[in-house]
Amino acid sequence: MKPFALAGLLQLTERRAEGLSRAVKLAHGVWLRARGRQVQLASLRDAHVTGLAGRLRGGVAAGQLREMNRLQRAQAAELHAAQTAIDAAHVAWQARLAEWLQVEQRLKALRLLQQRHLAQVAIQQKRIEQHQHDELVELAHRRDAGRWGR
């Protein structure tokens, strides 16, 4: 019987799908860590704002107020950078996911073709076995007919 003609391609596609699966998981982890960093920064900012509100009620010098404002701007810039990192990580994750899904569809199609090939091979094998059986029966019948005909 002929081997599955696309076996090599199927094997390569399986390896590619496995590699892409790992890449999707890695990209998702990067995205989750970026989100965690943003939550951490927002929590620090909120704690700073709460502390700042208490200090402002008691009054602060102009120099201290400038320093507090500078710190708030720095925190806002960090939060913006964190959001940018989240967005980039999300885009990368979605791109990997889309690529993996495409390869998975190709893999599914190749596996279906392989199943059809195996089914066809099984049918051919049954036909060969049936043909061989029929030949044996015919030979036995001729042999028996030759004995009785004498």
Stretch-by-stretch model annotation:
Residues 1-150:
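Charge-rich amphipathic alpha-helical interaction elements
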